[in-house]
């Protein structure tokens, strides 16, 4: 009995001490969703959570979705995120952000490490998940070097005594906390960009050996799970080099008979305006997210069997959450239109 009580207390304290960040809000919000209620789950980095508006998609098309997304998500954790999601949800389709494979092996001068090995992006996932066998496997297989501090993350945060007196942290003590926007975060400013059309580039640039191996591992996992997956590239200020990498990824994905969509090839159809719809070169603002969600929502409805739940009484909560969310978003839209 003592061991059980100590274990429960240890886990709850670990959850309490974890800082409440965007990544934490998203993952704990996912845990708060009712079992088997999500039709689509979008996995990846910030390219997910500032682009896809789950509640807007529900209002317009009727299917439910969630952004299981963390800042700078590294590619090696994606299969474990899928495994975590499948514990409680049975989505018709997963959307997997391919940017982690594009930026994963880029060198970060601040940390003197390649991106996918950096501590912070890995912790954005591991330090917000429930303690479980899957989390332990993720840490052992995704972290280089000593792993104890990842398994027991309270060691990193125990000195943050402010957590004990912050009401917001107490709301996350069970690692479940409703996320009313379903993992979406609006970018509220504008950066004017010049975006070059690179859709004519058909050359392929092979990924590094590490990224190629991780992509293969993920494709094999999805194949074995017999899970529908759409591998997707969000629209941004893409370079020719990036486009060549995505062309290579498209070929690899096709070898496994899986779906691929590069929304940069549809920038005109989406209607993104470089002078008004971007937050920075890598992300859209709310106005851009509105357009991206409309395009992608229509694409998903055409290509996958997604139900319309708008008249289902079990999902009235989604209708109310949309109204509340959209009210807040309208204020941001007005500000962006004035900029």
Segments (PLM) and residue ranges:
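Membrane-embedded segments
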Residues: 43, 47-134
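Extracytoplasmic/secreted proteins, especially bacterial periplasmic and envelope-associated proteins
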Residues: 52, 77-80, 120, 137-142, ...
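Alpha-helical transmembrane signal-anchor/signal-peptide segments
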Residues: 16-37
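Secreted/periplasmic serine-hydrolase-like ester/acetyl group-modifying domain
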Residues: 113-225, 309-339
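Hydrophobic membrane-insertion alpha-helices, especially the h-region
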Residues: 1-15
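C-terminal regions of proteins
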Residues: 247-320, 326-327, 331-339
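Loop/turn elements at helix/coil->beta-strand transitions in domains of secreted/extracellular proteins
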Residues: 37-39, 62-64, 90-93, 223-230, ...
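Flexible, glycine-rich surface segments
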Residues: 187-274
């Amino acid at each position: 009995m003592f061991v059980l009580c100590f274990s429960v207390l240890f886990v709850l304290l670990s959850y309490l001490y974890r800082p409440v960040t965007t990544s934490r809000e998203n993952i704990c919000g996912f845990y708060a969703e009712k079992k088997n209620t999500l039709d689509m789950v979008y996995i990846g980095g910030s390219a997910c959570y500032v682009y896809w508006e789950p509640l807007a998609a529900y209002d317009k098309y009727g299917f439910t979705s969630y952004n299981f997304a963390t800042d700078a998500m590294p590619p090696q954790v994606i299969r474990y995120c899928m495994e975590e999601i499948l514990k409680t949800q049975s989505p018709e389709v997963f959307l997997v952000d391919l940017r982690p494979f594009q930026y994963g092996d880029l060198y970060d001068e601040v940390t003197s490490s390649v991106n996918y090995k950096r501590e912070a992006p890995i912790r954005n996932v591991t330090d917000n998940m429930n303690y479980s066998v899957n989390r332990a496997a993720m840490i052992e297989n995704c972290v280089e070097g000593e792993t104890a501090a990842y398994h027991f993350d309270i060691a990193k945060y125990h000195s943050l005594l402010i957590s004990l007196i912050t009401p917001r942290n107490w709301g996350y003590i069970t690692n479940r906390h409703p996320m009313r926007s379903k993992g979406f975060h609006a970018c509220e400013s504008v950066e004017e960009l010049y975006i070059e059309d690179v859709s004519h580039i058909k050359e392929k640039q092979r990924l590094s050996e590490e990224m190629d191996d991780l992509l293969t591992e993920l494709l094999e996992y999805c194949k074995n799970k017999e899970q529908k997956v759409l591998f997707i590239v969000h629209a941004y200020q893409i370079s020719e080099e990036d486009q060549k990498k995505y062309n290579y990824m498209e070929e690899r994905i096709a070898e496994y008979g899986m779906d691929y969509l590069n929304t940069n090839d549809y920038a005109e159809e989406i209607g993104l305006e470089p002078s008004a719809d971007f937050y920075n070169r890598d992300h859209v603002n709310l106005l851009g997210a509105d357009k991206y969600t409309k395009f992608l929502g229509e694409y998903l409805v055409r290509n996958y069997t997604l139900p319309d739940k708008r008249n289902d009484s079990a999902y009235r909560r989604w209708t109310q959450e949309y109204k509340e969310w959209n009210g807040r978003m309208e204020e941001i839209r007005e500000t962006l239109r004035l900029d």
